[in-house]
């Protein structure tokens, strides 16, 4: 068995990636989220495949086909809710995975980090297009509002929006192409994940101390396969409780009303995992400025290696920056809350304050805190 594992051209790749991979001996449960994201992706592709067998991407029948899946298909309701709540679990794991990377300075592995940012954009695009497919009120108006933001681009904006729509409004052509992209993107994401892992295995994993761990490595299997299995059990438990007991808790009731271009919902808002970015978008009165802030709210992650001023990699031994980090986490929670609120006093000013705080912490306060810590510890 050992000979096959180490000599077979295909199996040896798996062996070097998941079995004999040298891993730091001290990585904590925060390093579980990579494998959990892989599990989420597998769940989404499988459930999505079964949904696609019964779904029709036509404005006249899309809503009815989703109803048909829930009522008439064997375990269709389960597959549909697993897919919908699987997206939420996916984003929870994604945010925790990125948060771990920021906390422990994993962004210094630049290729891996940048590939991760591309993956984040790809997953967000996939989730957005998936939300349009049930063709409920929030699907239609969400698609209209978000795609319309591209009209803020000078000169080509309006043409670009009509090109994406395939007409003069969100209609049949839009739904069909969104379904096509929503179907193909997860497979592109899977390929990008392999590139992400390829870059990661060039350098090896980071660890909670932020120090070089070459002198103290252990094989990935059995130590971290068993550890990941615990994470899988916890994730599946939370996932099934959410899916079976509270399937609609994260959804919007408006999406149970068929799409109607003639009536606008009282509050147009995206799914909860986009609310922080939506709040940043809305906090700027100018349309183009808002769109740029929206893109920058994610793209700012790419600047983190350039903004790293500390002589230490992780925040483990850096209490000042730690404080900034947890204020940033609280700020993101405030932005998520604000994104779901109507545009009126006092939510407008809270959203603007939280948006300024978000960019200030990442671009100004954390780099300054790093320099202060260097001086305190005489590291310069």
Curated annotation (Swiss-Prot):
GO terms for molecular function: metal ion binding; ubiquinol-cytochrome-c reductase activity. One of its GO terms (biological process) is mitochondrial electron transport, ubiquinol to cytochrome c. Changing residue 237 to M: In strain: Isolate 2. Pfam families: Cytochrom_B_C (PF00032), Cytochrome_B (PF00033). The keyword Methyltransferase does not apply. A ubiquinone binds at residue 201. Heme b b566 binds at residues 97, 196. Its cofactor is heme b. Heme b b562 binds at residues 83, 182. The chain crosses the membrane at residues 33-53, 77-98, 113-133, 178-198, 226-246, 288-308, 320-340, 347-367. Binds 2 heme b groups non-covalently. It is a multi-pass membrane protein. GO terms for cellular component: mitochondrial inner membrane; respiratory chain complex III. Keywords: Electron transport, Heme, Iron, Membrane, Metal-binding, Mitochondrion, Mitochondrion inner membrane, Respiratory chain, Transmembrane, Transmembrane helix, Transport, Ubiquinone. It is found in: Mitochondrion inner membrane. PANTHER family: CYTOCHROME B (PTHR19271:SF16). Heme 1 (or BL or b562) is low-potential and absorbs at about 562 nm, and heme 2 (or BH or b566) is high-potential and absorbs at about 566 nm. The cytochrome bc1 complex contains 11 subunits: 3 respiratory subunits (MT-CYB, CYC1 and UQCRFS1), 2 core proteins (UQCRC1 and UQCRC2) and 6 low-molecular weight proteins (UQCRH/QCR6, UQCRB/QCR7, UQCRQ/QCR8, UQCR10/QCR9, UQCR11/QCR10 and a cleavage product of UQCRFS1). This cytochrome bc1 complex then forms a dimer. This is Cytochrome b. It comes from Microtus duodecimcostatus (Mediterranean pine vole).
């Amino acid at each position: 068995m050992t000979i096959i594992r180490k000599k077979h051209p295909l199996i040896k790749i798996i062996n070097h990636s998941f079995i004999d991979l040298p891993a730091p001996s001290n990585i904590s449960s925060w390093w579980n989220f990579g494998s959990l994201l892989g599990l989420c992706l597998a769940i989404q592709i499988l459930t999505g495949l079964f949904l696609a067998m019964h779904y029709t991407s036509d404005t006249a029948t899309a809503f009815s086909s989703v109803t048909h899946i829930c009522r008439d298909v064997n375990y269709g309701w389960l597959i549909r809710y697993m897919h919908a709540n699987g997206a939420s679990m996916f984003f929870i794991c994604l945010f925790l995975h990125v948060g771990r990377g920021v906390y422990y300075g994993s962004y210094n592995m630049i290729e891996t980090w940048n590939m991760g940012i591309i993956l984040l954009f790809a997953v967000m695009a996939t989730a957005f297009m998936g939300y349009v497919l049930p063709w409920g009120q929030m699907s239609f108006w969400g698609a209209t509002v978000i795609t319309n933001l591209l009209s803020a681009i000078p000169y080509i904006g309006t043409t670009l929006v009509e090109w994406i729509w395939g007409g003069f409004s969100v209609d049949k052509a839009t739904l069909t192409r969104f379904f096509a992209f929503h179907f193909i993107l997860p497979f592109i994401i899977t390929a990008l994940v392999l590139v992400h892992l390829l870059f990661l295995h060039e350098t090896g994993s980071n660890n909670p101390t932020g120090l070089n761990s070459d002198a103290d490595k252990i094989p990935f299997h059995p130590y971290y396969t068993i550890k990941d299995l615990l994470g899988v059990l916890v994730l599946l438990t939370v996932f099934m409780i959410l899916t079976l007991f509270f399937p609609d808790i994260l959804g919007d009731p408006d999406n149970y009303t068929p799409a109607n271009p003639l009536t606008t919902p009282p509050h147009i808002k995206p799914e909860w995992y986009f609310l922080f970015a939506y709040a940043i978008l809305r906090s700027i009165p100018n349309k183009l400025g808002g769109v740029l802030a929206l893109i920058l709210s994610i793209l700012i992650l790419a600047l983190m290696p350039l903004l790293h001023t500390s002589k230490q990699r992780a925040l483990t031994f850096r209490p000042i920056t730690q404080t900034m980090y947890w204020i940033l986490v609280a700020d993101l929670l405030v932005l998520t809350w604000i994104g779901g609120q109507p545009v009126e006093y006092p939510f407008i000013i809270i959203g603007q304050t939280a948006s300024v705080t978000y960019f200030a912490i990442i671009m100004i306060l954390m780099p300054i805190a790093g320099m202060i810590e260097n001086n305190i510890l005489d590291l310069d």
